[in-house]
Amino acid sequence: MNKGDAIDFLCEKLNLQPTAVAHVEQIHSGFTNFSFFTELKDGSKYQVRLARKDVPLNRRNEQIILDLVTPIFGNPFVYFDVTAGNAIKKWIEGKQPKRPTRLFLEQLVASLKKVHAVEWKQFANEIWIFDPLIYFNQTKLPDFYKKLYVELTDKHKAIPKTLCHHDSTFDNLVYTPKKQVVLIDFEWSCVDNPYYEIANIIREELTIETANQIIDLYGSLDKKLVFETVIYVLLFAFQWTEIMPQTQQIIDYKKWVQKRLNYFLKALFPNTWKIAKTIPLY
């Protein structure tokens, strides 16, 4: 996908002439889509999302969750193709922070708690209920990690379920000029629990020191279980890379997962690390 594709899509769906577009630039090339910032000559700003065709995603699930969180974050979508996943959204002014301040973490936690409080059970037959074993039998985890993974996921069976963003990394939020955190990109959102939500942010973005801050800010979470969940989420991320097309981007991400797994095991679970360091993920 390129800028021309984004312009063509925007003009087709909004009934514009290409001459109405003043500026377009690619801002993201993710595992599931390409995103472009576009500005029209009248000052209107949009994000164009063009979905990759080789990624298994349930767009109806995304649509349901977008409707559920609209009272929290509003609805920036002006066009959404529930079949293909292509979309046009009004541009949300703000940034993705490079380093998380305490104020940012406070606002992130506040936004996450609002999502976790949303009533979802009326859509229980349609919405994605996360299954940590969804890819388990399709991948090649060494036996040591398989056993560890099952032990860790078993600890989640009795935890109450909530609606979750499930991918609330800094790329998937906007920190607005008013110092509010608006969560965006609900492609992987589902019903799970806050432990996974917080652990996923930690494994993607945070040092152990900053991780302790966000755990304390969220409150009511067992810290040891959160860090165990970081290991679980990293092992899940590896399984996810195994079922994706093996592009260079995925291969590089797989290496990054191994690096982060080493970091957390060595620092927090040294006895497990002594064994794990002799058994690479792949």
Swiss-Prot record:
SUPFAM superfamilies: Protein kinase-like (PK-like). InterPro entries: Aminoglycoside_PTrfase, Kinase-like_dom_sf. This is Uncharacterized protein MG356 homolog. The lineage of its organism: Bacteria, Bacillati, Mycoplasmatota, Mycoplasmoidales, Mycoplasmoidaceae.
